[in-house]
Each structure stands twice: as C-alpha cells, then as structure tokens.
C-alpha cells in the first residue's frame, strides 16, 4: 500500500542532483548534518543514522544482550516483524502484549504478564503516527525501546528510539533509519557497530567490537534532509486530508495527537472488505502471534479489532 505522496521542491531536487553528479554518494558530510538536525525531533542527545529502522532495532537488542544478558521483551503482536525478530535473534524472550482500543500497547496487560526473571524491556509501537500513548503506566524499572517507525517526533519517554525513513514514511529516503538515545556508552557502541565494528586509527582502522554494514550513506542522508525540511508542510496537508475524509466514511477513526505524524488514518469498521478492495489497501500488519514462526497466545482485544482495521492513506487525490 502506498501510504504517502512525497513532494520535493525544485531546489531540493537540484541539491540531490548536484550530490549525485559530485559522486560523493557513499560516505559524506550530510549524514552528520542530518543526525544533528534530527535532534530537534527526537529530543535525544545522540542520533545515529542507519540504513534502516530494522538495523537500528537490531543494534539495540545486540547492545541490550551484551549489557544485561537475556531479557524479557514485551511488545504488541500488531507490528512489523523485524524488530521482534531482532530481539528473538539475540536470545531475548518475546512476550506479546494486547492492545487497547486505539491499537496501542496495553499497560494493564503488560503488568499482568510481567515477571522479574530477567531485565524487562517494553517496546510500544506508535501505531499510525501517534507520538504518545495515553494512560502510559509502567513500574519504572523497565528499559523502554520506542518503535517510532511511523512517527519521527515521539513525545513518549524512552531509553532508545528507532525511526524509519523508508520511501513510504513521513520523512523519506531511498532507505534509512535513526537510532536515538541519551546514553553515551550505548551511542559509542552503535556508532562502531553500524560501521563493521571499526574505529579509525591514524593510518587505517581497528576492529574493536562486533558490527555490520548498517550505516546511512550520503545520498540517503541528502534525500532524507530535503524530506525533513518539507515535513511540516506535508504534515499540514495530511492533517487536512484526515479532517476531510472523516465525513466520507462511517466507523470509528483512531485518534491522533498534536505531535502525530498522521502517517495514515485508521478506521475501525465491522465490514472493511469493501473499502480495502476499492482502494487496494492492506492491513498493517499480520498478527505476529498467529504466524508460523512465533508462539501462539491469546490476545483478545488484538484479535477482535484486527479484522476491522482499515488503514487509509492521507493524500487527498485518493478520495
């Protein structure tokens, strides 16, 4: 499903074209420029650009395994597969949590399922672009990893945030992500990890830890920067479209908050098939706990709401 239509000014296209013509598309200065600019949205001291949000999640769970050993990771089943797989890959225990009526992390269900056998990690999903989760209530000793793939400007408090700049996201690039944190030690680990575990020396480099090719290149950073500069204008257009379509469909629209990205409009309706067929829409996402790879469990509200979901793109010419 195409969720967004991106517009670039002639100036932006010229800047991107000049970068391509220069040949400086691999390593380059715009990665750091983008990281520094993004601090305004993440409200975190350290922002590490990656080649995908999946890579960012992978590094987070690698770091947490190294720091705390096996952890318990609590997350909704209504999410993209790669962050959950990354946690499982590093040996963490996956415990699926139900969602509330807004399709967001249900804290009450988490508190019922929580055990203290390992360090507890919660990974809420900012579904549809919301920036916060009303009624957010934890014990206070958890590590909070925010899946902000839909929302580049989260206001919910967390220890680690990963954001997506996939071509279909509110800030776009050919592909890319950002990992944001205030923890200096972790930031240094991530900077090395995304660059094959390397640290530069006077004449070459040394391998100081595990790592992989997870860095963002200069071309992706340049495109993401231009998209970032258009974010506020494009957001206003998405808000207008959201307001416009609320009168066109019957059912319950999920709420957006003042810092939401309005990634898409989610409609809960008893018979979604006709709308999904008409607009060629797919539900974000298949439920992970119902897939072959993950352990089945009971998530009553998730299972009751999932067949009723319609995710509507917020570009006006669709309607």
Regions found by a protein language model. Give the residues of each.
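Proline-centric
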Residues: 94, 98, 311-319
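Short beta-strand segments
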Residues: 51, 123-125, 223, 255, ...
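Active-site region of PLP-dependent enzymes
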Residues: 152-264, 293
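Conserved PLP-anchoring active-site segment centered on the Schiff-base-forming lysine
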Residues: 59-115
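Conserved PLP-binding active-site segment in aminotransferase class I/II-type PLP enzymes
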Residues: 1-67, 229, 319
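Conserved PLP cofactor-binding pocket of PLP-dependent enzymes
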Residues: 198-203, 244, 272-310
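Active-site phosphate-binding strand-loop segment of PLP-dependent enzymes
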Residues: 101-173, 178-180, 185, 311
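Generic structural signal for small/hydrophobic residues in well-ordered secondary structure
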Residues: 16, 38, 56, 73, ...
């Amino acid at each position: 499903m195409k969720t967004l239509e991106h517009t670039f000014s002639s100036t932006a296209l010229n800047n991107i074209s000049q970068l391509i013509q220069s040949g400086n598309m691999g390593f380059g200065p715009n990665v750091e420029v983008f990281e520094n600019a993004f601090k305004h949205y993440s409200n975190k001291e350290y922002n590490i650009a990656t080649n995908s949000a999946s890579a960012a999640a992978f590094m987070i769970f690698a770091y947490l395994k190294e720091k705390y050993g096996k952890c318990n990771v609590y997350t909704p089943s209504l999410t993209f597969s790669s962050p959950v797989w990354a946690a499982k890959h590093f040996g963490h225990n996956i415990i699926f949590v139900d969602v509330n009526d807004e399709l967001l992390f249900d804290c009450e269900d988490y508190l019922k399922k929580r055990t203290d056998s390992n360090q507890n990690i919660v990974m809420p999903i900012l579904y549809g672009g919301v920036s916060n989760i009303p009624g957010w209530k934890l014990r206070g000793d958890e590590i909070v990893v925010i899946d902000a793939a839909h929302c580049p400007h989260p206001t919910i408090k967390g220890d680690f945030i990963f954001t997506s700049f996939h071509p279909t996201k509110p800030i776009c690039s050919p592909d890319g992500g950002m990992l944001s944190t205030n923890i200096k030690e972790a930031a240094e680990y991530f900077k090395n990890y995304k660059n094959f575990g390397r640290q530069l020396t006077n004449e070459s480099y040394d391998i100081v830890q595990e790592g992989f090719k997870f860095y963002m290149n200069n071309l992706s950073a340049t495109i993401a920067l231009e998209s970032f500069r258009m974010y506020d204008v494009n957001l206003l257009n998405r808000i207008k479209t959201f307001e416009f379509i609320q009168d066109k469909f019957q059912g319950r629209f999920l709420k957006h908050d003042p810092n939401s990205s309005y990634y898409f409009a989610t409609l809960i309706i008893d018979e979604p098939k006709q709308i999904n067929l008409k607009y060629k829409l797919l539900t974000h996402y298949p439920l992970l706990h119902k897939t072959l790879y993950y352990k089945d469990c009971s998530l009553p509200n998730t299972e009751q709401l999932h067949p009723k979901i319609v995710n509507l793109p917020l570009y006006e010419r669709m309607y």
